[in-house]
Amino acid sequence: MKEYPVYLEQARSRQQDFLYPLLFREYIYGLAYSHNWNRSIFLENGGYDNKYSLLIVKRLITRMYQQNHLIISANDSTKNPFGGYNKNLDSQIISEGFAIVVEIPFLLQLSSSLEEGEILQSYQNLRSIHSIFPFLEDKLTYLNYVADIRIPYPIHLEILVQILRYWVKDVPFFHLLRLFLYHFCNRNSFITTKKSISTFSKSNPRLFLFLYNFYVCEYEYFFVFLRTQSSHLRFQYFSVFFERIFFDAKREHLVKVFSKDFSYTLTLFKDPNIHYVRYQGKCILTSKNAPFLMNKWKHYFIHLWQCFFDIWSQPRMININPLSEHSFQLLGYFLNVRLNRSVVRSQMLQNTFLIEIVIQKLDIIVPILPLIRSLANAKFCNIVGEPISKPVWADSSDFDIIDRFLRICRNLSHYYNGSSKKKSLYRIKYILRLSCIKTLACKHKSTVRAFLKRSGSEELLQEFFTEEEEILSLIFPRDSSTLQRLHRNRIWYLDIIFSNDLVHDE
């Protein structure tokens, strides 16, 4: 139980948080105003001074508690916020207030944990998306099975509110949050559909992102427990622990009982080589042991979602495959473990032996087809990868056009420099280079060949291929053999905290 005291102390401290009064503090909406969210929703009147108004917020909250608020005519959506009801304005204003207020206790918890020097030093590097890949390079080559898991959604909004109540004890705040979610997200249905979630995420992105991350955090909170104590649980009885009330007490009791007499016997059912990585709406679970334990985890996840989150999860949402026979997509890369076989000749006295050695190697590949589809959607090429001009940018200056294309190439090179094979990346850069030339030729109403011959832009456009070498030469020695070796090897950057806009996981 040495891993758990921090969580238990944090759980006790959260019981004293009171968030409801913060909704009536002007500085909360000042924070939302200063974060460049849609500022027009905070203006009391366009003809007066441009200041956010707490009076509007108080009137909106009061209106939400009124019974006649549920009956809305079709013409009310265009009324002034003082004389009538405006659904979009109400939703955005209160959503921003909820998002900022509900984040406060969790931000305080994060800042207090980062005050420790060791955590703060490692936190900066761990924020990077690329920090996942060196970890996988070290671990995946020793593992045998992988489970692709799609995290189920949408979760019912009432379940979200109930889960949040276990972490923050403030009854009035959650009454208002429940009213808000039902009035603006789930008014006419008892079932939360993907369409309603999509609409809510677009109109209230900050609050939606918090609720979704909180749902994933809660599910991983149980996963940590299952990871450490799954060998103690009989499958037909373990679901009783998913009741969130007194969860920590039940967990402590379980450890005390089973750690005394069964520690040696239960090691046969433990899986010490299991690794878990979550990204976007998916996660992967890898293990070295037999498929039996992976199937055990599959049933754990399905029952967790069904018993605790009331989500009907299909078994096909979790696919278990041998790692050497299966490739999976992770944060814009294709990953697969390749078997390298080599024969070694060994001679002992007059006898010669041939020994076959099998080494597993992780291949991290740029997904060329999804990237070409993304470039085609952005109008840089057609669906088969032939570069086309970008007429929308033709009104800009030559320098701005070239600079835009260079930024895209720079970002792609920065993101995909960890690839095992760079040919796909060079093809993407080639498409962008020709698209840039065609855009410039379109602007000057000329053919590509005539434009290059007249303007002499070939040297300038070589930056698409030379900029990466210049950056690497500043970091590493200028020896040509060193640079060639770096082009063949993978380079991970620990300053990437956002995925590229052209990266889409299928």
From Swiss-Prot:
One of its GO terms (biological process) is mRNA processing. GO terms for cellular component: chloroplast. Pfam families: Intron_maturas2, MatK_N. Its main location: plastid. Transmembrane segments: none annotated. InterPro entries: Domain_X (IPR024937), Maturase_MatK (IPR002866), Maturase_MatK_N (IPR024942). Usually encoded in the trnK tRNA gene intron. Probably assists in splicing its own and other chloroplast group II introns. PANTHER family: MATURASE K (PTHR34811:SF1). Belongs to the intron maturase 2 family. MatK subfamily. This is Maturase K. It comes from Lathyrus aphaca (Yellow vetchling).
